[in-house]
Amino acid sequence: MNGTMDHPDHPDPDSIKMFVGQVPRSWSEKELRELFEQYGAVYEINVLRDRSQNPPQSKGCCFITFYTRKAALEAQNALHNMKVLPGMHHPIQMKPADSEKNNAVEDRKLFIGMVSKNCNENDIRAMFSPFGQIEECRILRGPDGMSRGCAFVTFTTRSMAQMAIKSMHQAQTMEGCSSPIVVKFADTQKDKEQKRMTQQLQQQMQQLNAASMWGNLTGLNSLAPQYLALLQQTASSGNLNSLSGLHPMGAEYGTGMTSGLNAIQLQNLAALAAAASAAQNTPSAGAALTSSSSPLSILTSSGSSPSSNNSSINTMASLGALQTLAGATAGLNVNSLAGMAAFNGGLGSSLSNGTGSTMEALSQAYSGIQQYAAAALPSLYNQSLLSQQGLGAAGSQKEGPEGANLFIYHLPQEFGDQDLLQMFMPFGNVVSSKVFIDKQTNLSKCFGFVSYDNPVSAQAAIQSMNGFQIGMKRLKVQLKRSKNDSKPY
């Protein structure tokens, strides 16, 4: 419709050279011109041809330049993925040529902040026109039509935009503004997507921490029966004296913290276990832990070895020691929690006289209790363990026992070893966490490994974190394959 209109000898400075694909090979410049001149005057059409043939044959694509940018965009909106030309199976593909990407709008568009609300578009144009031709100027306005104190200015070239930034950024403070004017390149779509993903990641991590709070057992109650059953199994086993070795250690830690703890605080873990059990309507050892006050009094007494005639009391004292070491919700400091790490290392020796099954059961139970301690005090617990585990676990590739090593992928690009450690630490004692880095680009490969010191923690992590959404992706968490398998994972 516009093909017969008068036009200058050259296209406008902001005109776009477009690439067009899915064109019949039999079409010449004449047919193409007839098609495109419906949208505006055409300056040039260049059909790509295969010069190896004689005569050269069309490759089914071309470049086209309109006199105006508007005509090119109208043609693209009407034809791209919309119209199928005769003899073709797919619609026309029309987009700016690669050479045009060097002059993309996002590379020439400026954000102007701290603009006086009394300014209009003409005032902004007058301020920035000395730096070059302005393609577009727009002030952001609210629903009431009032200026929001910021604007966008698009120049015809990037060099003009750079000159404006260099000369105008923080050069003056406009009327009614508290800070100097801000002039910078506007956020690109990629920048906006990155910010959005970062915000989503922060929200997801906050939700993860919130889900681990003592008062919210949603993410933990499904695991509670495992740990409570293990405690119950140990407490009711025939070899009750095997637990008595924990008593002196429990008493030592208990008396060391009496200034910050009381009987109610010592029962917090038991109450937590009982609450988790109640959420599942499952009877548990939590009731046994809270039903007797004698273990609590024993913990604050001297560390003398208990009599073999009081095996049941010794058992309860030992479980009480686990309570103490797992921590309380008030009056507890980082040094108190530090005892948990030492306790973990001494657990095996304290059970040296016990049977293998009892030792294994209590070891797994302790891992569960450690998780509940993280639930009760997520921020303090993480602070303590990050200072201890972080020294050796983050970045190392030390493996745990069979069934305790996890393979995690779909990690965010910006995640490092410490981030991975912090995310998986609430489920148990992490012996190593490693995000793999591409040696060529020094960027994350978006997968990594986490190893625990026991399989129960690994299963807890899988249950809670597999499918956990971060940004646009969902984590995939699975057990690392055995060394005997042919594949590493």
From Swiss-Prot:
Gene3D superfamilies with a match to the protein in the record: 3.30.70.330
List GO BP terms, alphabetically: mRNA splice site recognition; regulation of alternative mRNA splicing, via spliceosome
Top-level lineage group: Eukaryota
Cellular component GO terms, alphabetical: cytoplasm; nucleus; ribonucleoprotein complex
One of this protein's Pfam families, by short name? Answer: RRM_1
For the region Necessary for oligomerization and EDEN-dependent deadenylation, give the residue spans. Answer: 183-210
The RRM domain covers which part of the protein?
A: 16-99, 108-188, 404-482
* Keywords noted in UniProt: Activator, Cytoplasm, mRNA processing, mRNA splicing, Nucleus, Phosphoprotein, Repeat, RNA-binding
Coiled-coil residues: none
How is it modified post-translationally?
Answer: Phosphorylated during oocyte maturation and dephosphorylated following egg activation. Dephosphorylation is calcium dependent and correlates with the increase in the activity of EDEN-dependent deadenylation.
UniProt-recorded Gene Ontology molecular function terms: mRNA 3'-UTR binding
Q: Where in the cell is it found?
A: Nucleus; Cytoplasm
Q: Which SMART domains match?
A: RRM
Question: Do you know which PANTHER family this protein is assigned to?
Answer: RNA BINDING PROTEIN (PTHR24012)
Its assembly, as annotated, is: Oligomer. Oligomerization is required for RNA-binding and EDEN-dependent deadenylation.
Q: Which family does it belong to?
A: Belongs to the CELF/BRUNOL family.
What UniProt notes about the protein's domains is:
The 2 N-terminal RRMs and a part of the linker region (between RRM2 and RRM3) are necessary for binding to EDEN of mos mRNA.
The entry's protein name is: CUGBP Elav-like family member 1-A
Task: Read off the lineage from the record.
Answer: Eukaryota, Metazoa, Chordata, Craniata, Vertebrata
